């Protein structure tokens, strides 16, 4: 059970950190496209500030979506008496995050996370979900051996 919680926690944190940093870079690319200079020092500082700021809003929402998706996958796999597949966790993670942002926008009537307004920003979030899912799946698959 500890490995399950550890796998989920690591997967969620990886997804959040990568998603936050990617989202920050999408926004800063828009700023740069307007002709403003964005230094590497500014990119690092803004990324750090966004990680702290988004940890109170985006992190819990991502945690719920990812834990629900991975939990459902674990439940289905255990009933089928099949082996867990690491890349299946990555697909579930990507799917959860790719569905999360448009659903939040639909329900709330506003984009909760500005970088997901563009297809590139949304895909970057999906990749972050996949990376976190891969980490979760790797840890989970090690626990069944």
Model-identified regions with their sequence ranges:
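Juxtamembrane/disordered regions of integral membrane proteins
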Residues: 1-145
């Amino acid at each position: 059970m500890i490995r399950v919680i550890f796998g989920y926690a690591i997967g969620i944190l990886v997804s959040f950190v990568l998603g936050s940093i990617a989202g920050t870079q999408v926004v800063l690319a828009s700023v740069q496209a307007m002709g403003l200079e964005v230094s590497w020092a500014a990119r690092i500082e803004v990324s750090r500030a966004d990680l702290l700021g988004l940890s109170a809003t985006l992190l819990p929402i991502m945690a719920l979506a990812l834990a629900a998706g991975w939990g459902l996958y674990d439940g289905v796999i255990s009933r089928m008496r099949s082996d867990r597949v690491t890349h299946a966790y990555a697909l579930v993670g990507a799917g959860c995050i790719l569905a999360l942002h448009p659903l939040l926008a639909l329900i709330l009537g506003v984009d909760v996370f500005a970088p997901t307004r563009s297809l590139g920003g949304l895909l970057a979030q999906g990749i972050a979900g996949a990376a976190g899912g891969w980490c979760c799946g790797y840890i989970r698959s090690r626990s069944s051996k």
